[in-house]
Amino acid sequence: MAFKLQAPYSPAGDQPEAIQQLTEGLLNGESYQTLLGVTGSGKTYTIANVIQNVQRPTLVLTHNKTLVAQLYGEFKQFFPDNAVGYFVSYYDYYQPEAYMPVSDTYIEKDLSINEELDKLRLHATSELLSGRRDIIVVASVSCIYGMGNPTEFENGIIRISKGQVISRQGFLHSLVNALYSRSQEEFRRGTFRVKGDTVDINLPYMDYGYRITFFGDEIEEIESFDVKNGKRIGKLDNAAVFPANLYLAPKDQLQQVLYEIQDECKAQVDYFKATGKYIEAQRLSERVNYDVEMIRELGYCNGVENYSRFFDRRKPGTRPFCLLDYFPKDFLCVIDESHQTIPQVSGMYGGDRSRKLILVDYGFRLPSALDNRPLNFHEFESLLHQTIFVSATPDHFELEKTGGVVVEQVVRPTGLLDPPIEIRPSVNQIDDLLDEIDKRIRKGDRVLVTTLTKRMAEEMDKYLARINIKSKYIHSEVDTLERVEILRQLRLGEIDVLVGVNLLREGLDLPEVSLVAILDADKEGFLRNEKSLTQTAGRAARNVDGLVIFYADKMTESMQRTIDETDRRREKQVAYNIEHGITPRTIIKSREQVFGQTSVLDIKGFDPKNPYAIANDEELVTVAAEDQEVYKTIPQIEKAIGRTKKEMEKAARDLDFMEAARLRDEMFLMQKKLAEMKA
């Protein structure tokens, strides 16, 4: 099937020329191109047109999960008949394994996996290996981290057809080899159950399952059915059952893998003994022998990913497989907000390696664990075929790759101008801000407020709640899908003010926002440099009444450059509007369009009749963002209580009694929830 773009409008403003230049560049074999597009100029729509023109599988890579969710929703709207995948880290909580030699403290790996995100990851990879070329995968930096061998994953696909001759027992063995588990009681994702001649499979990457009926050694019927109520959806002549996990190891080579692990362990233990490190030698020997026995008996162990090089049959030092290996060689890579995404991709390898080197040096892991890692930047570049950088503020790397040549998209189809920027003193800034918020709320508009720290964001939200202003805060500790829910709330008018730190920036499509207030704008640094100020100010560029207020007591170079660039763009935009007789207008999106742009929520059973299913303001006054995490099982919430108690005790030891009190309240809430779950 070919990509077929569906939109109620046609390219306008600078879009037609940008689409033509980018398409011609790809067809002429250019490796790198840069789209410099201002906020609200329709960069996503431009890229969608380019994808339709070149008809290639596409990876859209961006730097934060909130933006991934928005782009996923937009591409789903543009390409409803094509495959659009969502690929981010599936952890709600992740504490990596680490060792701190100074205090002799070993921190065991701790994590909580979000099953819905895992389902979306599996769905994206399954679609890629299905052979279809009309696929777009929107991903975070998680796509450069190690995954299973795509060849083994593809070999693990079970293809069945009506009338096929295969014994029921043989089919069940195939399911087990594909990492499905048998379960008669709890029919979870990635399990199957057997009732007489019928086998039900709960597909881990879909919302439905397969029901296969046997007649002797022949498949008599294949049906798809709703796993929640068992009702039949339809009949099939053919079906493909993809593996239940991305980490599929070859069973026939397991014994050889274990021998190789033990050989490396012996060599490393001998090295430790030769250098007088007897404690490290004993620690490593005990740990590896235990892991080997676990793998031999159960097929896995805690931290099995540290042995991935052996299971993947890779040579020492070679890169791991990742999502990019699942794409065909001629895929198109679009790096959105490249000024943020490129540095993030570059930094992953170094941080991971420094942590693991300590684990290896002190006998907690084998040297081969260093090969369980994200790609370094050179490896990432080597996998790219053709790349389009997209940013309103491209950095030196993008400009160097394209020889300083950019495709500029400054004029918006809506005729909207960059919002004017006002500078106001920080004295009485809160009173002034409240006056401005009141004006916007009366008009039915929304407001974004950015602070310098997470604590300031939370305190600001509490203050606004106390004076009956409907608000929420959002920062990196708010769960992935909860961030999208909060943005949906803002757009639908359930809340009027959103307070943030560094997430209220790149790419967020919020036409309802007419005021962006930046507190401490003169505190020069990472959060208040030219790129940050430009990106944050751009959130008001989708509204005809957009205004940006810098609360500052002095003019910094970053502030001045931001204002100068804004004035330059406004001049060009005004001239274009006069020439073409365009009157600027806000694009007000319908309720259905808002739900469409945040459609990633709908995969977790989101109920459109109750779209505000997150914590209320009363709870937020006393409980921080991480307290709202949804723990679905008793073991999960017990682990969370233990973790919170440790953090509370540490805060008390550090004499941070406000934080300790907050954590105490959080722990009490979770204990109450645990009691209700056990009742």
Question: Which functions belong to the PLM regions below?
Answer:
Residues 87-442, 461, 465, 495, ...:
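N-terminal cationic and glycine-rich segments that engage phosphates or anionic surfaces
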